[in-house]
Regions:
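Structural signature of the two symmetry-related core transmembrane helices
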Residues: 74-88, 271-286
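Helix-to-loop junctions at the C-terminal end of transmembrane segments
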Residues: 59-71, 256-269, 352
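Helix-loop-helix hairpin linking two adjacent transmembrane segments in secondary transporters
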Residues: 135-184
Length: 383
């Protein structure tokens, strides 16, 4: 493969990761707007949001087989175009049932895109001279920042929700037009003609890395959904500071992902993954134990540093392990990861209600210790 062709392959992956982050960040500010438009209560809105997870859980296990049959380019392009139409629909509909239907489709499209873009990223990394997975995930984080900021800027300048949404969707369409033709035509680098199983079930070391990913996604979901409540109710800070913790966490993660590939080249995947887990555990302990505001905010920065490159390292390893084809392994790991996102924050709510939020976050720290031990065992087994 010519160098210029490889560079375009790499740029196309960056573009699609940015698109995925932009899509999620376009929907997030619409949540309170949709809730207000429908005139529904929090519990109904929660059930509607669950539709995204249900849609993702339906499509993710199937996407590995789809990528092998149709190739990354076709699946990513179809999923991206679907998301454009769905997001526009969500900016318009006024029926609870229509919103539920659109969110199911949105979750399915996001699930398809998430799995296939990581398959494409792993396959491109395998033909690249050095590790670049963390950089790709950094582009996803960049898309989230740009999308959220762009939507807020549009609304603050008097644009309607429809117009703000359309601006984001035009950017997404431009990304598809520029990069879709540079994506990989295949979705599996194995030479086997054997038909891929319809549903990806983890096998071998993929089982262990699925658990590792599930815990990482659970922790990310916990920080996203519960950090504001922890800051305001446990540390008794002003409600205006509720979003500060997650913002600091996200900024740290973004910065460290762009430096993650250099860290992997210098220190190795094992050191980056295990070191990150230890750092994130220390961040949670600082959050629980610190009586000072500066310690609280520092803890979120430490968590972001620690968690930033764990998932990129796992996806990179999925392209090198031999227990499952890459496409199936990534689909399996992604599915279990999203189980953590869906179930983790809800479990924290139940535990917090029965005990306290401090104890619930302490259990997360224990889970990270377990995650570290599992990862250490798997790397030892691989060696």
């Amino acid at each position: 493969m010519e160098e210029i062709s490889l560079k375009w392959r790499q740029h196309s992956v960056r573009g699609i990761f940015f698109l995925a982050g932009l899509a999620g960040a376009t929907w997030a500010p619409m949540v309170p707007i949709v809730k207000q438009r429908l005139g529904i209560t929090d519990d109904i809105m929660g059930m509607l949001l669950l539709c995204i997870g249900i849609g993702s859980m339906f499509s993710m296990p199937l996407t590995g087989a789809m990528a092998k049959k149709y190739g990354c380019r076709k699946v990513i392009t179809v999923a991206s175009i679907l998301m454009i139409g769905i997001l526009f629909g969500l900016s318009q509909v006024n029926s609870v049932y229509m919103v539920a239907a659109f969110l199911l489709l949105f979750g399915s499209a996001i699930g398809m895109l998430d799995v296939t873009m990581n398959i494409n990223a792993v396959l491109v990394e395998k033909i690249s001279p050095r590790s670049i997975m963390s950089n790709y995930h950094g582009m996803w984080s960049t898309g989230c920042f740009v999308g959220a900021g762009l939507f807020a800027l549009c609304l603050s300048n008097g644009l309607s929700v429809t117009n703000a949404t359309c601006i984001s969707l035009l950017i997404m369409a431009a990304i598809i037009a520029i990069f879709s033709g540079k994506l990989l035509e295949y979705g599996d680098d194995s030479n086997s003609e054997e038909k891929a199983p319809l549903i990806a079930i983890p096998k071998g070391i993929v089982v262990f890395f699925s658990i590792v990913t599930g815990i990482s996604f659970l922790v990310e979901g916990a920080v996203m959904d519960w950090s504001g409540i922890f800051i305001t109710e446990v540390h008794n800070m002003d409600i205006a500071l509720a979003g500060t913790g997650y913002s600091i966490y996200s900024a740290a993660m973004l910065l460290c992902r762009f430096g993650g590939d250099a860290a992997v080249r210098r220190l190795g995947r094992k050191t980056v993954a295990l070191g990150g887990m230890v750092i994130s555990c220390l961040g949670f302990l600082l959050l629980i134990l610190s009586p000072w505001e500066v310690g609280t905010f520092a803890s979120f920065f430490i968590m972001g540093i620690g968690l930033a490159n764990v998932v990129p390292v796992v996806f990179s390893i999925m392209g090198k392990q031999k227990d499952m084809p890459s496409a199936q392994a990534i689909a399996a790991v992604s599915t279990v990861g999203y189980m953590g996102v869906l179930g983790g924050p809800a479990a924290i709510g139940f535990i917090s209600n029965a005990t306290s939020l401090n104890i619930a976050f302490g259990i997360i720290a224990i889970l990270i210790v377990i995650q570290t031990l599992i990862t250490r065992y798997v790397f030892k087994k691989m060696n």
